[in-house]
């Protein structure tokens, strides 16, 4: 969690990113990487920006600012047009409609200080559900004849069943990952038993890479080390995690390329100037 001062600094850096990518944004999925680079630049020039240590900033803690940074002004304009249209439709219902709009305010307020849509399915479901209720009550309704009456019944069974199966595989995957971590990254078979690694893809992939590096160093396998380096260098473009820089430098060191190892290490220290690095 970040303090009020830290959030203001996140807004400040995020706004600078948006000013440099005004129309089209920096690209979807780029916030983690581009924020880290802008933050490091601010720290390097002595700007009075709050220290984040080794913490990663995944979101600016403001939904509209998040869209501005990654998508630019265009998606925000589109969203505002939808909001205005929705409010106009709802106002036709009088005072009762205004009470319905009030259901949105707690969630909308939350989106300006946190990132509920980014990491909370419940917030998103509630938000969509409120839209559905208001649209059903005050919106224009269209009806069509469904000749295949069995389809809704089948979907009512299939969707919950698939959801339960998926959630069970997520729990099993989390359990296996936890067991693997408790072994000190030694028993790879726990990781291999995970049924749904895609549900925790980033965490799973990073753990798999960690085990890849451990095995490669132990076996002194240069091909495995080069393979690891190739994968991590690609990942760093969108996920510049501190531990990846440290491990990548270690991989180059294992290959005997100390010059490159120090280059990677210094790059990591530049991006994470407040972290506790071990020289």
Regions found by a protein language model. Name each.
Residues 146-174:
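Internal/C-terminal transmembrane anchor helices
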Residues 96-150:
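Transmembrane alpha-helices of multi-pass inner-membrane enzymes
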């Amino acid at each position: 969690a970040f303090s009020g001062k830290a959030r203001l600094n996140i807004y400040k850096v995020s706004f600078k990113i948006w000013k440099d990518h005004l129309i089209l944004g920096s690209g979807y999925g780029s916030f983690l990487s581009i924020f880290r680079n802008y933050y490091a630049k601010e720290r390097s020039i002595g700007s009075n920006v709050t220290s984040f240590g080794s913490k990663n900033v995944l979101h600016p803690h403001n939904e509209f600012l998040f869209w501005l940074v990654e998508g630019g002004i265009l998606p925000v304009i589109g969203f505002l047009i939808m909001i205005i249209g929705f409010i106009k439709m709802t106002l036709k219902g009088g005072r009762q409609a205004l009470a319905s709009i009030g259901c949105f305010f707690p969630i909308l307020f939350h989106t300006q200080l946190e990132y509920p849509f980014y990491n909370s399915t419940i917030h998103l479901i509630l938000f969509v559900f409120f839209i559905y209720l208001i649209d059903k009550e005050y919106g224009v309704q269209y009806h069509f004849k469904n000749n295949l009456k069995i389809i809704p019944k089948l979907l009512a069974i299939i969707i919950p069943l698939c959801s339960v199966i998926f959630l069970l595989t997520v729990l099993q995957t989390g359990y296996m990952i936890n067991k693997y971590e408790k072994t000190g990254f030694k028993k790879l078979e726990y990781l291999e038993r995970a049924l749904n690694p895609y549900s925790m893809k980033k965490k799973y992939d990073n753990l798999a890479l960690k085990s890849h590096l451990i095995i490669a160093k132990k076996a002194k396998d240069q091909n495995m080390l080069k393979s690891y380096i190739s994968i991590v260098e690609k990942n760093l473009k969108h996920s510049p995690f501190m531990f990846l820089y440290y491990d990548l430098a270690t991989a180059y060191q294992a290959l005997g390329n100390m010059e490159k190892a120090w280059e990677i290490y210094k790059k990591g220290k530049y991006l994470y100037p407040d972290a506790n690095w071990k020289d």
